Amino acid sequence: METIFAQSSSFGKAGVAVFRVSGTKSLEVLKLLTGKSNFKPRFMYYQKLTSPESNDLIDNAMVVYFKAPNSFTGEDVVEIHTHGSKAISIMLTNALLNIPGVRLAEAGEFTKRAFLNNKFDLTAAEGIADLINAETIMQHKQAIRQAGGALEELYNSWRSQLLRIISLLEAYIDFPDEDIPESVLKDVTNTHKTLINTISEYLNDNRKGELLRSGLKLAIIGPPNAGKSSLLNFLMRRDIAIVSNIAGTTRDIIEGHLDIGGYPIILQDTAGIRGESNDVIEQEGIKRAIDSAKKADIKIVMFDAETLDSAVNEDITGLIDENTIVIINKIDLIPENRIFNIENKYRCLKVSIKNNIALPSILKNIEEIAENMAGFTETPYITNERHRHHLKQALVYLKDFNLDNDLVLATEDIRMTMHRIGAITGIIDVEEILGEIFKNFCIGK
């Protein structure tokens, strides 16, 4: 394979910039850049870097050589740590490009080579990508567990059980006249039933892992002028929505990203929902608000305490479910002991966004719902639609398995189940999906 390189750190001004080189010419590249002939693997050296063509000094750098297979990619690898300067990065990149047999790496190519050299499986590679993209503590916990091989271990345990079924049955395929012993039939049947139940239950996870990976959508809905935009600004801790006492100020969906209790929340402030409007633009805003609420994982339904009874309508209450927080805003403007009809049906939070009354309770309720929907558990969840697709197909083959059928055909159902699970981890030939997975990595990883 060609020797590749890339800047693994961000391009720009920084304390340190890190370049990575991987391939058979890595050590030769290091010698050309430094003029030094001997490098002990896994030792850092302070060296002058010069351009092999012009002999111009590039920088004083720290360099280290990792000898195959004891490196991230499994190949010879060199890391070069320079000062974080755009000029230095450009000069070093040009110097490397001018060395024959060395080229710039494609996105995710270092991780792809590590996978091809059996450093980890595909689920761990995806975990590394998720770890790089993690923005919250809970996303980090899920990603680092996957990168550490938790999903690989789970899926391989299922493959091992399937392999055991095949090994038990294949012993009798060549001897069709012999009856399969009762003990073998019982072992196969029990393992088969257990796997069906285990994988079925695993798939019935309400997409918790995928929600945590992508973020939970939270739609703020309610009648006009209830304080929805003020709530969005409070949650975002900055003004991203226009706040006005004029009904219908918000026409389109305004979105913001938030970390609540370690859970990634995608906030959506929507247009006020009211029964009648002659404004075509406002009508479209209301339609989008309702659509947004229907697709949301969490909903906040907000009412103005002064106009609540007249503002409640089926368009709004019809959207309330178990993952909805009902908020009565502007309680500072009404008598303290007032009870609303809506409180007889739903648990409501009484707050004042403007006067900072009971606002922590909103954050607490959001976190509780998020934890219930995407909370961290001992068993690693499915984090990727690719895994779910293959597991569903595996379950189809597993359910088709029947010992009353021809033994060869029955064994083939188990083999196809193994094939589908192997496609998740990369045990089988999966060249057609590698490009799709690794293109989402950054250059230099």
Swiss-Prot record:
One Gene Ontology cellular component: cytoplasm
Keyword presence, Magnesium: yes
HAMAP family reported for this sequence: GTPase_MnmE (MF_00379)
PANTHER family cross-referenced by the UniProt entry: TRNA MODIFICATION GTPASE GTPBP3, TRNA MODIFICATION GTPASE GTPBP3, MITOCHONDRIAL
Subunit organization: Homodimer. Heterotetramer of two MnmE and two MnmG subunits.
Name the record gives this protein: tRNA modification GTPase MnmE
Pfam families referenced in this protein's UniProt entry, alphabetically: MMR_HSR1, MnmE_helical, TrmE_N
Major site of localization recorded for this protein: cytoplasm
Enzyme Commission (EC) number: 3.6.-.-
